Amino acid sequence: MKGPITFLLQLGAVYTSIASACKLSDLPILSAHGSYGSNQCIAFGGEQAVIDRLIDPQACDIPKLIEATADQLQDGLTKGCFTSVDLVKVRITLQTPYRQGNVLIIVVVQTYVARIAEVNSTVRAVTEINPDALTIAKQMDNERKMGKLRGPLHGLPIVIKNNIFTDDKMSSTAGSYAIFGARTSADATVATKLREAGLVIMGKSGASQWANFRSLNSTNGWSAYGGQVTAAYIKNQDPSGSSSGSGVASDLGLAFATLGTETSGSIVSPADKSNIVGLKPTVGLTSRRFVVPISERQDTVGPMARSVKDAAYLLQVIAGKDSNDNYTSAIPFDTIPDYVKACDINALKGKRIGVPRNVIKIFGSPQTVVDQFNQALAVMKKAGAIIVENTDFTSFAEFAQSPIPDDILYADSLTNLPAFFKQLKVNPHNITDLESLRRFTQHHRLEEYPSRDTARWDIALQKGIKNTDPKFWPMYQKNVKFGNEGGILGALRRHKLDAAVLPTDLSPYIPALIGSPIITVPMGVYPNGTKVNHDRELVTSGPGIPIGIGFMGDLWSEEKLIGLAYAFEQKTHARPKLKRFIQPKKEVKGIL
């Protein structure tokens, strides 16, 4: 690499370059808020926490970060056991003389960043670290010292999917070099909400390129920009997608929690495979402004966390209306519900929970998954739920054979991607539509074409139907029937259900069609003796891979679903029972 200074984050194949000729002991502060100039530097190494410690850190009951909750972390911050700076602190040492031309600067990282460095060369969950993280953490610590707390997540580090644009020094690429270096005029609305709530956006997560909407022969979690994400339970585990890195980062405690996006399964499926909670909100509950789109009808942004309560905390922050996303105007309440308060251990009592058995029969599930699913139903029944069997999705067989759901995505992408590209303030490769995106991808070496094809784009362009075409509306009405009367909403109405449940890997398809919510919770694990299957080099099924259960509900029913999922989680505590083949060892206590 060339340039006056190369700032090399030792995160496997992940590098962030900062071209700035600071002194040996200095490095530029790069501010996400634009408050520091490029000529300003700060000396790193030996920084003192801005908050005087109230007690001896060694006397604190500091949780292991792989299971730490927001409440536990806030308790430690409040007591002065550690600071937000401790969670993201970075110390820089020069390894090679500057004048040799190729300067290597090693980052000696602490806590969350150190945890990323421990495992990222294997799992590739994080594509880059925010060079502003320390600056923002110091600001949050100073505010805490002055008695100003922005909310219950104040000062906690978070990692967000790399298709969510931020107006800072980090890249937002959707995993592609086609928009590497692209800029928007502001943060994505959800990123702004995170900052306003006091969270430290610490980095970006790897994901399936273009949210799994490029290839038919690629693998979950692969992108040209970030490489191949893998999950942590067996070697070369398929992480599912497309929010692959967000799932793995949350699972391994590489941040307090993460954000993902979903069009059809892209939050709940990777959450399932990484043994965490994934909450796909109703389309319109969270803004998609400056989030790389596929479909305006199906795209949504949601939390991925190690517990239901932490997912609820995060949803509380990012939910709400946004004049820049007209789908949010459909939110039916003036005040966002208290999602954290919905976490009630008795929430299952008296609730009618439906089981659409025809989905399991038509799509098929291994018997071990069905057995564990039935055991989960027994847990709910014991907790007071009324289990209603055979609440079938009546149009599911027709849906399973229909090309229409994909055709809707093709039409939306032909319309929504050009609209997004038009919003870019900086567009280095002049990507204006799906055709120019395909052309770039097929001619750029790092995009690995044709070994990873562009079949989804090829089909969309060949069909040539946009969502403004007269042919689109009849297709869309059929799609709505699959999801509404013939799907989840019809089942809820006919059987007077509070929710329906399925093994998570079967849950996303129908709710995707009408934008209804899902929350997945850890349920179990594939046992010894499970047949090992592969997709290219990735293991898609085998002993030790997690299994989740998905709670599906009506539009805007997140409050109810969170309660049901929380009660199930507290009755089962399935997550801590599983073993990983890799996990970081760095802890807060070890760096104080």
Curated annotation (Swiss-Prot):
Its EC number is 3.5.1.-. Keywords: Glycoprotein, Hydrolase, Secreted, Signal. The active site is at 161 (charge relay system), 242 (charge relay system), 266 (acyl-ester intermediate). One of its GO terms (cellular component) is extracellular region. Glycans are attached at residues 120, 217, 326, 430, 528. Residues 1-21 form the signal peptide. It holds the Pfam family Amidase. Substrate binds at residues 242, 263-266. InterPro entries: Amidase_dom (IPR023631), AS_sf (IPR036928). It is found in: Secreted. This is Putative amidase ARB_02965. It comes from Arthroderma benhamiae (strain ATCC MYA-4681 / CBS 112371). The lineage of its organism: Eukaryota, Fungi, Dikarya, Ascomycota, Pezizomycotina.
